[in-house]
A protein has these predicted regions:
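Active-site neighborhoods and metal-handling regions in enzymes and metal-associated proteins
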Residues: 1-390
Length: 390
């Protein structure tokens, strides 16, 4: 773990030097974990050169046990911070902060404390670093995929007509926890959140919501308007299981489609077409292939197959992507969309989910967490992809 943490800090320091930023202060819990191995509350001061210092306000004793960093100090007051930054990085003319997640009130506080320094947004640097997973991270993600597979294997035990969606979901959630799923699923975007994921049946599958994805679901109330609801699952219903498993912090996103009985012919055809698009995107991903090229290809194929209106959603609720990066957060880089032009490169991990919605009834397609190994995309999630009749 020490080698991993040192490598991450070293890479960020290289980027700080390139932009002539003397120091960065990391405060967001996921970024703290990435650079220290601990989520304990505090400030990680990373100078462009030299040793990083983890200033911890709570829990100091736990942080000392969790992090391999040698410079870990107790922060009794915010007033210590400017002095510690000076000791760690010298005179700071440019100070890097995670402006994509930092509350405005805290930004003004840092601005006042470091009045002589220009504040620079280092969020893009951090997100791009985290986009490329190391072999250490890939192995953790593979273990998360095993949890996902075992959870999906258990679906036929729990999926019964007459049960409510939320009851079925709770059984899968209980199993996932006992297999090692940490429970919490972290997202970085403002006001984006998810609890395990989306399990919906019948007409609820195409019930849209604020969630930035092709599906939403009613949830239990408008207070949390996504995911499984109170609907009773009926014989003949198509059931979507789109759940995230998180092992040692790392997300795996996987979707499979189930049916209580025989799937309708229209769904079978749409599912085969969605799988075809899925496989063609995987084949097309080579070193240097742009995210935008993969996205444009998928949307073009869907339109040619007759799904232009219902690929990745309907109307204004349509998702503009076919995949999203996964790691310590569910919404990482790269995003497989026409607007992003990152080239495929070793270490990229993302959830690939070209889906076709059949309004009011069902959804076709799967979601796999995939890894670009330097030559091509390989699937990390391993569960069978056909519609599973129960």
């Amino acid at each position: 773990m020490k080698t991993e943490i040192d490598s991450r800090i070293g890479k960020l320091q290289g980027k700080l030097k390139e932009q002539e930023i003397e120091a960065a202060i990391i405060t967001q819990s996921v970024d703290l974990f990435y650079f220290t191995g601990s989520c304990q509350k505090g400030h990680l001061i990373i100078p462009a050169e030299g040793e990083a210092c983890y200033l911890v306000s709570k829990s100091f004793e736990r942080a000392k046990k969790e992090t391999p960093l040698t410079s870990v100090e107790y922060q009794q007051s915010f007033r210590q911070l400017p002095t510690k930054v000076q000791e760690t990085a010298g005179d700071v003319k440019k100070l890097g902060l995670e402006l994509d997640v930092l509350p405005a009130a805290l930004y003004f506080r840092y601005q006042e404390a470091f009045g002589g320094a220009e504040i620079i947004d280092i969020s893009p640097l951090i997100k791009e670093l985290r986009m490329y997973k190391s072999p250490y991270e890939i192995e953790i993600i593979r273990k998360g995929a095993e949890i996902s597979h075992r959870m999906l294997e258990a679906v036929p035990r729990f999926l019964k007509a007459g049960r409510r969606e939320v009851e079925f979901a709770a059984d899968l959630e209980h199993l996932a926890r006992t297999l090692g799923h940490q429970g919490g699923v972290r997202m970085r975007q403002y006001n984006q959140e998810v609890f395990y994921g989306h399990i919906m049946s019948g007409e609820n599958i195409t019930f849209s919501s604020f969630f930035d994805g092709p599906t939403g679901g009613p949830g239990l109330s408008p207070a949390y308007p996504q995911g499984p609801g109170w609907k009773i699952i009926e014989q003949g219903d198509v059931v979507l299981v789109d759940y995230v498993t998180v092992y040692n912090g790392y997300c795996v996103d996987c979707t499979r489609v189930f049916c209580l009985g025989t799937p309708p012919q229209a769904l079978k055809k749409a599912h085969q077409d969605a799988l075809y698009i899925h496989e063609e995107v995987i084949k097309a991903a080579k070193p240097g292939t742009l995210c935008s090229e993969l996205s444009n290809m998928a949307f073009k194929m869907a339109a040619e197959l007759g799904y232009g209106e219902n690929f990745m959603g309907y109307g204004t609720d349509k998702a503009g992507f076919i995949g999203h990066g996964v790691g310590l957060e569910l919404d990482e880089l790269p995003v497989i969309t026409a607007k992003q032009h990152f080239p495929m490169a070793e270490g990229m991990v993302f959830a690939l989910e070209p889906k076709i919605l059949l309004k009011g009834t069902a959804i076709a397609g799967v979601e796999n967490t995939v890894y670009f190994n330097g030559n091509n995309l390989e699937k990390i999630t391993i569960h069978p992809e056909e519609i599973i009749s129960v």
